[in-house]
């Protein structure tokens, strides 16, 4: 969450022309974005594995899924006002909503080795298979595109299902579960709030930063 916040703050500074950076082509920024999304989905997969192990009810799953989907729709609407030509139609929350269903009702029933293997297949497949059919806004969510669509955020099922499957597999390892249950160090304990309220933080951090930068520009501080 901290890394994501710093990344988005730099993106916002670029949006307000405070710094000049190419967030769409510069490897320094594109690799960071890929790493942040990968960690986000890895943690989502780990969380889903924990929820299943604890016997999460269907009601609680669908309530959480509804929250994710509602936030995804808000992101689409908000991005349409800010970037009408490149609004977000299938970003990280849209992808997560669909992937959570796939993992919950399908892939979670597979053995751990299969999760590792299918995760690798999901990551590799777009490098070998692509077709213009998947280049439209109604089909690019699959991920087998021949070119990246014009959008501010794009997290299709392929390859991004891979990290979520790996997260699910990772939490089946006893040593990992034991390590995750250790008490947090006092210095990082306050950061756990972001983890417990991850969706709320994700939705609020950008409006807060954008509002602060707009206010700073209004008062001539930028």
Label the predicted regions:
Residues 1-222:
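Alpha-helical transmembrane segments and their immediate juxtamembrane cytosolic regions
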């Amino acid at each position: 969450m901290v890394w994501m916040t710093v990344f988005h703050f730099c993106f916002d500074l670029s949006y307000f022309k405070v710094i000049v950076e190419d967030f769409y082509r510069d490897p320094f920024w594109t690799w960071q974005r890929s790493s942040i999304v990968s960690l986000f989905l890895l943690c989502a997969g780990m969380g889903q594995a924990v929820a299943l192990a604890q016997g999460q009810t269907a009601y609680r799953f669908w309530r959480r899924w509804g929250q994710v989907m509602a936030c995804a729709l808000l992101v689409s609407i908000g991005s349409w006002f800010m970037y009408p030509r490149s609004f977000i139609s299938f970003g990280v929350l849209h992808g997560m909503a669909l992937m959570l269903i796939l993992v919950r009702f399908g892939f979670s029933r597979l053995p751990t080795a299969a999760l590792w293997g299918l995760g690798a297949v999901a990551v590799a497949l777009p490098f070998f298979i692509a077709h213009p059919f998947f280049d439209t806004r109604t089909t690019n969510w699959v991920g087998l595109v021949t070119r990246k669509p014009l959008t501010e955020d794009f997290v299709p099922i392929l390859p991004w299902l891979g990290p979520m499957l790996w997260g699910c597999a990772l939490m089946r390892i006893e040593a990992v579960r034991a390590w995750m249950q250790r008490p947090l160090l006092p210095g990082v304990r306050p950061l756990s709030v972001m983890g417990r309220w991850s969706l709320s933080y994700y939705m609020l951090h950008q409006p807060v930063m954008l509002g602060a930068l707009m206010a700073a520009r209004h008062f001539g501080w930028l």
